[in-house]
Each structure stands twice: as C-alpha cells, then as structure tokens.
Regions:
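N-terminal auxiliary segments of SAM/dcSAM-dependent transferases
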Residues: 1-75
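A general structural signal for well-ordered alpha-helical segments in protein cores
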Residues: 8, 27-28, 58-59, 68-71, ...
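S-adenosylmethionine
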Residues: 137-139, 143-283
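An acidic site on a long C-lobe helix of protein kinase domains
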Residues: 54, 94-97, 222, 249
Length: 283
C-alpha cells in the first residue's frame, strides 16, 4: 500500500529519467486513466492509499511510456482545443500547433454564421469536430483514405453529439467529392519528405501511422493532388482553402500553387506559437 502522492512521485521520477519532458503531468494522466478518475481526484485524495495490484498496473503503464509509447496510444485519448478525442494507431495524434486552423477560422467568421466545410484527411476528426462545436451553424464532411480512421472519426462525432451535422466518406482527397458545395476546405495532409522520415523523433515514428506522415519524395505530393483537383473543379465561387504546411517546403509549395493559378496576393502565411510557418490560407 502506498499513498497516491508517493506513487505519482515515483512515476514522475521514472519518466523524467527517461527524458519525458512533461513527466509530472504524464504521471498524473496515466494514474487517472488507470483509476478511471479525473486528475483533480489525485490532488484532492493525495493521501489515499492504493493496493499493490493497482500500483503494479500503474508501473506497467509508466514502463510503456518510458519505452516510447505515446500517452494517446496508451489511453486512447488526445486533447485538442480543450477537448478529448478518441485516437488510435490508425490516426495521426492531434497536435496543438494544428489548433491554429481553428483560430484562423474564428478570425474570419462570426460565431453564428452558416457555412459548409470539408476536412480532407480527417483522421480523428478533431479539426472538423472542433469547428462544428465552436460554430453551431456549421455543417460538413470529413474524408479519409483509411476506413479505420473513418471509424474513429465517427466515434468522436457521436461522442460530441454532432453526427447530425457531419458525415464521413472514404475518399482519396477530393476524388469522391464535389468541392464546389463547400465554403471552406481544411486539411493537414502528410507533408514530411520521404528522405526525412527516418530523422523524425522515434516517438513519432513509433506511434503515428506512416501514411499520415509521408509526403512523397518532395513532401508536396498530397498538396499537389488537393490543389490541382480544386483548380480543375472550381466554379469561381469564393471559398477558403486552409492547409497546414511544413516550414521546410513552404517556398516550393508557394511556387507550385502560383504555377497552377493560385494568386500570391490571395495567399496568407500564418505562424504558430513557436514562430514556425504553419498554415496557408488562400481564397
């Protein structure tokens, strides 16, 4: 038997030893997950003693995290824009940097406006779900090439009671979709150049599906598919294309977009909270 505060201290120390930067937070997340209680419970009940069986289960979770398995893979959850979303090894872990897309759309549109949005490569559907939760009159579609990802997306939409405003389709980008029915297109496509994949942090390679990372030889393969499809189908109705980008290839991407007819003066580059080039918005 040990007190919760002692158990957490041991977990924190073990994670810190294995260079987990947010060791204190993650030790709490894992114990709250194992006990099925909110983290606040651990603080309020820090003197509560747990039996050896629970301690053993917790240490196994700490070991998995120390060996490089992500918190989201262990718990099946990931926070995005202040909400928890179900995830799995079949979808990219939502990143806080991607929240910039939500903030940009909140700058463009009033909260009560009605808009239709399509989320290409929806994965967990954290983006389109968050938009529909922030904008009660938005509706939309999420697409993904992976049926497993679509299943996770549907689960999250149902969890947040927005499944009457969003549907999900298995599609390779815009192949099965008429883009002209939407006001906003959002996407966080795979953008890592193939030769750079091996240099990614082991935690990323260990936990995220390769299909959600691999941007082809130049990192632009999927942008080209999306952008060329838009140009082929566009009926000149004003829309917003909002895409997450990779800082190392952004100049090449701008060059490509201009070559196929996107006007540079209609494209805006946004920086994230780390001052990295992160999102392009085009009208």
């Amino acid at each position: 038997m040990q007190k919760i505060e002692t158990i957490l201290s041991d977990g924190n120390r073990e994670l810190k030893k294995n260079k987990i930067e947010t060791s204190n937070l993650e030790s709490q997340i894992l114990l709250s997950f194992m006990l099925g209680v909110p983290r606040e419970y651990l603080i309020i009940n820090s003197n509560l003693k747990l039996d050896d069986e629970k301690i053993s289960k917790y240490r196994k979770l700490i070991k998995r995290r120390s060996e490089g398995e992500s918190i989201s893979n262990i718990t099946g959850k990931r926070e995005f824009y202040g909400r928890e979303f179900s995830v799995s090894g079949n979808v990219l872990d939502p990143r806080p940097e991607t929240e910039l897309i939500i903030n940009i759309i909140k700058e463009i549109y009033a909260k009560d406006v009605s808009c239709s949005v399509i989320d290409l490569g929806t994965g967990s559907a954290c983006l389109i779900s968050t938009l529909l939760l922030e904008f009660p009159n938005f509706k939309g579609i999420g697409t993904d090439i992976s049926e497993d990802a679509i299943n996770i997306a549907q689960k999250n939409a149902k969890e947040y009671l927005i499944n009457d405003r969003v549907s999900f389709i298995v599609s390779d980008w815009l192949d099965a979709i008429d883009f002209n029915q939407f006001d906003i297109l959002i996407s966080n496509p795979p953008y890592i150049p193939r030769e750079e994949l091996e240099s990614l942090p082991l935690e990323v390679l260990y936990n995220d599906p390769l299909i959600a990372l691999d941007g082809g030889m130049d990192g632009l393969e999927h942008y080209k598919k999306i952008a060329s499809n838009i140009k082929n189908k566009n009926n000149d109705k004003e829309k917003f294309l909002i895409i997450e980008i990779y800082e190392n290839t952004v100049d090449d991407l701008f060059h490509y977009l201009e070559n196929i007819g996107f006007e540079r003066e209609n494209m805006i580059l946004y920086y994230d909270f780390s001052n990295r080039k992160r999102v392009i918005v085009s009208k």
